């Protein structure tokens, strides 16, 4: 049975990746497993990939790159600072107190006087009060300490960092080699960043790995339209985003990004600290529950767990909680959130049929929508309407089934054969759904398909509304 329409992405590490644990996560509602390469080696990653595939060929895999970042460097002992103190960020070590460098050679050159500099995910704030050719002199704004290899953010400042690091390149090549489904690339600022990742995948012999662009700063937000056009999907990565832009601007950015993804018919993932309390506690805060609910009400395809499942004390409970919240919210949302003209281009038959099917779900008691989607495009566009009934595709492509694991309300059944005629597809699909207990003979379903000869790829061409029993009998096979 299908318990929810919203998809769940869960982060796991090699420290807790036994097949039994992965199965428990999957049974609790996880659709996609995420691997954070910031904390893993190639060997660790391969171990997790192998274990996931032992459990199910329908669980999608996502490798998350570390991306370009600036960190503190050459600090032997923590620098203790108080409000009003001065520190020096220099291009190379100098004989001055409170001095440190960064791992990015262009930092001093590219950061102007007056800029805000944040250390360790925003824990320490300083302002550049003077600039010399080889150093920035900064004034501390709050008490704290500066440790080695801590993150540095410069809100509103565009640094000329390379889009793909050597470490990223190695993991992208690994994703291509092991046929991973998604690459989530960090700190995407322009469509060119997406193209850079695609070039590595193509050169590695697997251009079909799908790219999820992580939006984490103002540049990415400003360029969301061009990034969405170039990407398979988008992740709203609210951790670094909440450091790079004012915290009160994050909900507005989240909504803008979600609406842009809906506009272009691509999946969107809402991420970071969704059930952060459950890393240490068995129950979430009311604010966390509301955060998840609002993400779903705003139209997200998927919601993500990070530390909650990677190293938290209650990983299965966190997934079950997320599933429970999703099920409840989905029952109380409007049938569809979006305008009637969404994807309503009458020159494209597919879009007209999709719109008719969505309208039918509002007026009739429809149990399920069965979509004959050879490449997934029709299913992804239908998902964008966020209908209140699940969409099912039957396919012999494991890759397609896993790609659709990110799309709202879309579920896949895998078969061995490649249907030659639509009749075979419909009958097989309905019989499988009956066996799974999703539908019974008297339930009404919508069937969407293309040319009766499935070898002729002409796209979506017809819609049928029928009971399961009559749809099978009418095909007489």
From Swiss-Prot:
EC class of the enzyme, as a word: transferase
Pfam families hit by this protein: PK, PK_C
Annotated Mg(2+) binding sites: 216, 240
Binding site for ATP: 36-39, 71, 150
Highest taxon of the lineage: Bacteria
Keywords attached to this entry: ATP-binding, Glycolysis, Kinase, Magnesium, Metal-binding, Nucleotide-binding, Potassium, Pyruvate, Transferase
Site annotation Transition state stabilizer: residues: 214
Stored PROSITE patterns: PYRUVATE_KINASE (PS00110)
InterPro entries hit by this protein: Pyr_Knase (IPR001697), Pyrv/PenolPyrv_kinase-like_dom (IPR015813), Pyrv_kinase-like_dom_sf (IPR040442), Pyrv_Knase-like_insert_dom_sf (IPR011037), Pyrv_Knase_AS (IPR018209), Pyrv_Knase_brl (IPR015793), Pyrv_Knase_C (IPR015795), Pyrv_Knase_C_sf (IPR036918)
Enzyme nomenclature, EC number: 2.7.1.40
Binding site for substrate: 34, 239-240, 272
Catalysed reactions, as listed in the record: pyruvate + ATP = phosphoenolpyruvate + ADP + H(+)
Residues binding K(+): 36, 64-65
A single GO molecular function term of this UniProt record: magnesium ion binding
Gene Ontology cellular component terms for the protein in this record: cytosol
Listed cofactors: Mg(2+); K(+)
Pathway: Carbohydrate degradation; glycolysis; pyruvate from D-glyceraldehyde 3-phosphate: step 5/5
Subunit structure: Homotetramer.
Family: Belongs to the pyruvate kinase family.
Name of this chain's protein: Pyruvate kinase
Species whose genome carries this gene: Borreliella burgdorferi (strain ATCC 35210 / DSM 4680 / CIP 102532 / B31)
